[in-house]
């Protein structure tokens, strides 16, 4: 049976305590790497920037020499420096002012069978990639292998369980797979002033798949002043992530700012503020599923502008659903959502609560819905506040299996009117300014 409650009254001040708590914790200042002043020009180790010479051994020798002396900065000057996989070390800065280019598919060690990631490291501390230049992944020939069973593709930058990581100022283009992948027990990560480009996943000639821009899981993460357009998630993180701030970023093609789908270990104190989205498949996407879930709480999205996005707000816990009617999110109806089977609650059940959207304006793509908030029959999404939010779309906002969803001075505009809500098993409170 459809359960829908709409209350039109002022929300008691006590109900907004969690919102104030979220805003108070929103600013994140990660510790920056401490790197000695010593400089190591890679040309001193035999590197040649002619776009033809393979410089893997020379650049690795420079990294190893700097690490052996206690750290320093490697200089990649003007020119095009081809290289295979490189292993970073602690207290090393790789400053790229020219172009550092991955070897092409036909020459890259391991090919599609066992390729190492391009720039990688694990259990390191105080590492930086910066400069005014670019890192080019030459990814186009790799991208079709996304559909080849068993084929592997290298990531451009991959760090695991590292402390104090800085990526700043660079242009990252056309990675074979993820551009920045940081995982494990990592803490204090700053990605600032970085531009990331790859073809859209809908490109008619050569779509790029799984070319995520920033997959950064850990604690104390700042993504600031970045310009990103890729073929997959513009940002995403997994479980075990806390204290994240994404601010002043511009997003083009891609799947938006995402959380999940693996969320075991929980995600908390996550803030996105002062960002724009143009032509993204989704704006904000929170995704998980049974058997890979955790507690997601204190998520804040403020001062966002979205134009021609596929789905401005997408929150759901059925990411791995196999039934086609449950996967067709744009056409999901209350009647279909109400048939989603209930399961027993376990420690891996996704829990979504305390989510704020404030001062968000979005225009969806033609034929798309304003958004979707879809919990599980056994675990509803709880405490969602839409405050001064205006969503314009051809289809309404769907709210299924959700409790205490509050709309304050907010408007869902569709051809059928203002604030049409498709809902089932939901409690929605609509209040004036």
Language model features by range: what are they?
Residues 2-11:
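Bacterial N-terminal signal peptides that target proteins for export
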Residues 19-21:
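N-terminal signal peptide c-region/cleavage motif recognized by signal peptidases
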Residues 14-17:
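Repetitive helical segments and hydrophobic/amphipathic motifs
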Residues 24-433:
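Extracellular/periplasmic carbohydrate-active domains that bind, remodel
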């Amino acid at each position: 049976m459809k359960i829908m409650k709409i209350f039109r009254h002022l929300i008691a001040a006590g109900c907004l305590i969690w919102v104030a708590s979220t805003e108070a914790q929103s600013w994140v200042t990660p510790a920056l790497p401490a790197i000695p002043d010593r400089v190591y020009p890679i040309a001193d180790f035999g590197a040649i920037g002619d776009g033809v010479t393979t410089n893997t051994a020379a650049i690795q020798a420079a990294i190893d020499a700097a690490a052996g002396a206690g750290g320093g900065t490697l200089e990649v000057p003007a020119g095009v420096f081809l290289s295979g996989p490189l292993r970073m070390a602690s207290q090393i800065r790789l400053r790229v002012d020219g172009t550092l280019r991955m070897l092409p598919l036909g020459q890259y060690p391991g090919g599609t069978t066992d390729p190492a990631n391009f720039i990688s490291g694990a259990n390191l501390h105080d590492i930086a990639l910066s400069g005014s230049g670019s890192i080019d992944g030459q990814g186009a020939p790799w991208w079709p292998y996304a559909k080849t069973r068993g084929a592997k593709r290298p990531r451009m930058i991959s760090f695991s369980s590292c402390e104090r990581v800085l990526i700043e100022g660079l242009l990252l283009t056309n990675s074979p797979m993820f551009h920045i992948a940081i995982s494990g027990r990592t803490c204090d990560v700053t990605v600032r002033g970085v531009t990331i480009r790859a073809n859209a996943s809908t490109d008619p000639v050569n779509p790029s798949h799984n070319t995520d821009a920033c997959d950064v899981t850990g604690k104390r993460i700042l993504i600031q002043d970045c310009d990103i357009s890729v073929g997959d998630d513009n940002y995403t993180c997994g479980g075990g992530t806390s204290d994240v701030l994404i601010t002043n970023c511009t997003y083009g093609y891609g799947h938006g700012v995402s959380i999940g789908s693996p969320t075991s270990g929980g995600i908390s104190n996550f803030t996105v503020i002062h960002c724009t989205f143009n032509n993204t498949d989704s704006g904000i996407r929170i995704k998980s599923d049974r058997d890979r879930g955790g507690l997601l709480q204190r998520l804040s999205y403020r001062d966002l502008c979205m134009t021609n996005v596929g789905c401005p707000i997408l929150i759901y816990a059925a990411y791995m659903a196999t039934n086609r009617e449950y996967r067709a999110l744009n056409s999901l109806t209350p009647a279909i959502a109400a048939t989603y089977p209930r399961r027993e609650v376990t420690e891996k059940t996704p829990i979504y609560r305390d989510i704020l959207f404030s001062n968000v304006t979005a225009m969806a793509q033609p034929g798309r819905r304003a958004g979707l908030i879809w919990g599980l029959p056994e675990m509803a999404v709880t405490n969602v506040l839409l405050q001064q939010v205006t969503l314009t779309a051809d289809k309404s906002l769907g709210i299924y299996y959700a409790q205490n969803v509050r709309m304050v001075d907010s408007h869902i505009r569709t051809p059928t009117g203002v604030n049409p809500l498709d809902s089932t098993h939901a409690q929605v409170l609509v209040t004036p300014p």
